[in-house]
């Protein structure tokens, strides 16, 4: 049985294990975010920003990837993304619009037809652009179906042999009492059921938030 700390405002269910996660820090990615980075496309190389939050329980850090933001018009040089002001500006606008209650927890790089292996150049890019101690890197080759998470361990990025996919309840229906509607012309009453649909809002549990990063934009 997988042991997960249930945080307030989060409904995790139907957790699926990918690979063989060893003991230590854990990575959880929401099914919709996982599906998004695997969407079929003609693009040979893609980059995503992971939004979510982190938690710590008894010294074990858990990274929750709740959403994946595609980075549009990313420039590449020898399969390495060239992060610049233009790319980050688009990302920050999307964060400000839709993800102010989350933080950046890492990123993903998909290079079709190339083994998803960490190189010194990629690690340098990660350290420069994603310096957080618990920000993860997800390398993919969607053509061959290979993928690996990397996280900080000591002073290096180390591969994680497995991770977890969880399914968050995004919408649920609440039944409220029938509403009586007066029909003045006929002088009769009609009972109509009304359904209220609520959206579940993600909650971040860290003191760093994306909207604080964007305060000066």
Please give the residue ranges for each predicted region:
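N-terminal beta-strand/alpha-helix entry module and adjacent surface
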Residues: 1-106, 111-199, 209
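Acidic, proline/serine/threonine- and glycine-rich low-complexity intrinsically disordered segments
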Residues: 202-203
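Conserved small/polar residues in nucleotide/adenosyl-binding loops
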Residues: 206-213
